Amino acid sequence: MDAGTIISLFILGSVLVTCSILLSSFSSRLGIPILVIFLAIGMLAGVDGVGGIPFDNYPFAYLISNLALAVILLDGGMRTQASSFKVALGPALSLATVGVLITSGLTGMAAAWLFHLDIMEGLLIGAIVGSTDAAAVFSLLGGKGLNERVSSTLEIESGSNDPMAVFLTITLISMIQEHQTALSWLFLVHIIQQFGLGILIGLGGGWLLLKTINRIPLPSGLYPLLALSGGIMVFSVTTALDGSGILAVYLCGFVLGNKPIRNRYGIQQTFDGLAWLAQIGMFLVLGLLVTPSHLLPIAIPALLLSLWMIFVARPLSIFTGLLPFRGFTLRERVFISWVGLRGAVPIILAVFPMMAGLPRANLFFDVAFFVVLVSLLFQGTTLGWAAKKAKVVVPEVGRPQSRVGLDIHPENPWEQFVYQLSADKWCVGAALRDLHMPKETRIAALFRENQLMHPTGSTRLREGDVLCVIGRERDLPALGKLFSQSPPVALDQRFFGDFILEADAKFSDVAFIYGLDDQSAVDQNRTIGEVVLALIGAAPVVGDQVDFAGMTWTVAEKENNQIRRIGLKVAEDSDE
């Protein structure tokens, strides 16, 4: 490869990435998932598109996709809170194992019938498309305001269900090559090995990387690179030992994100940009890899297979996998069934048969790509609508315009939050002394018309003021309400109820004041928080609702899996 060719590749790559970034701004306006835009640009640049670029280097695509997945999952793990694991670890692992087996089996049997394949080849297609995709889930769920139980279950499921799909794919390829039709007992051993090594090396490698980052003094710009290289090393070593590298790198990121770590905010900001670059690069390459003209002959059976998986296989797997977990409402189960987002992982798994030289490998790849397109276009575009219909959305708390960590020490939790006040903010016109600031927070600076003010307690806030507030992450909900817009309060009342009560209030007192219906089944000395928690039957999340004693009780605030505040409204008005 000469210098001219290398420069041409640089130009081509930069043009494609730039176009992807610029066109991504249209995704929200058009209601199209941003990943579809990245994929479409790759297809347009490919052999059947305007670019006409011939690309069929499957090993290179496999390399780029795995590297990108490692970066995306490392970033996703860092952003997963430990509280999410307490709420959703059991259900997510059930869906990542039993759920994938059921989805793959049902989809595989349908594929064998639709494409006139033998049962083993059909099951291979089912295994390829059987798992949800972490990149798609993290990208499309962000900013939707889902309750914690639903969002955590979907995110942890997407980060942990790939080992089962990868193992099923590799096992079925081997069985097809050796003309086997029955599984051996080694199947179970290999599954345990995949999950076991992924968990062990992921947690152990994350802990070792954390200690290294906190112990060694480096220029601030090198900490993100050390975290990135360490995460990729965990991914690579686990994969080389026949474990799940995808699960390992996700858990490695989880350890880094939930323990005190030096230069946390610099690492997170760098990872955010790298994760976007990884998604763009991965979907561009996968878009280049497909030949759209090959999708037309299989369009009808592939569409039927997609609909079967969306409306039959996925819901059956979800309802079966969540049977032991009574904390999920019917609406939550239906919504989780709908969010079976497929993305890069099925396409990457479809490369395995190509590299193994299976006779119908091209068909497997084209079917997987078609299923991914249908999933992103159909399920991805209706995600917001489905969440509202299922009532799994909770009112969003106002967020700061920006936040910067005060990296004085790894154990230091303090941050600076920046809020800009628009006309619809409640606090506009209020004096600083009248603001009910959360304990241990301070207004560090006030800017007005680009000038630094020297405020006093009598200074009144105006539209356009910029406030710099020192606080901690736990203060964000209270600060968000303080600096939130006026309209959402009406939404809060409609969602949580007209009355927000402290969870430590005695149930007997509340029953007397509000004249509740028959409550003989309840210990009158218990608090309303204890009563609601018992009725939920699982770790509570904001937005949990139970109907009891003629009222709807809604968890309005919680801390460390303990209910702090509860909304109350008449049950007959709950669906308005």
Swiss-Prot record:
Signal peptide: none annotated. It is a multi-pass membrane protein. Coiled coil: none annotated. The keyword Cell inner membrane applies. It holds the Pfam family TrkA_C. It is found in: Cell inner membrane. One of its GO terms (cellular component) is plasma membrane. GO terms for molecular function: flavin adenine dinucleotide binding; potassium:proton antiporter activity. Its main location: membrane. The chain crosses the membrane at residues 3-23, 30-50, 58-78, 87-107, 109-129, 185-205, 221-241, 280-300, 303-323, 334-354, 363-383. Residues 403-485 form the RCK C-terminal domain. It comes from the Bacteria. One of its GO terms (biological process) is cell volume homeostasis. Keywords: Antiport, Cell inner membrane, Cell membrane, Ion transport, Membrane, Potassium, Potassium transport, Transmembrane, Transmembrane helix, Transport. InterPro entries: Cation/H_exchanger_TM, FAD-bd_PCMH-like_sf, FAD-bd_PCMH_sub2, Na+/solute_symporter_sf, NhaP2, RCK_C, RCK_C_sf, Transptr-assoc_dom. It catalyses: K(+)(in) + H(+)(out) = K(+)(out) + H(+)(in). SUPFAM superfamilies: FAD-binding/transporter-associated domain-like, TrkA C-terminal domain-like. SMART domains: CorC_HlyC (SM01091). K(+)/H(+) antiporter that extrudes potassium in exchange for external protons and maintains the internal concentration of potassium under toxic levels. Belongs to the monovalent cation:proton antiporter 1 (CPA1) transporter (TC 2.A.36) family. NhaP2 subfamily. This is K(+)/H(+) antiporter NhaP2. It comes from Cronobacter sakazakii (strain ATCC BAA-894) (Enterobacter sakazakii).
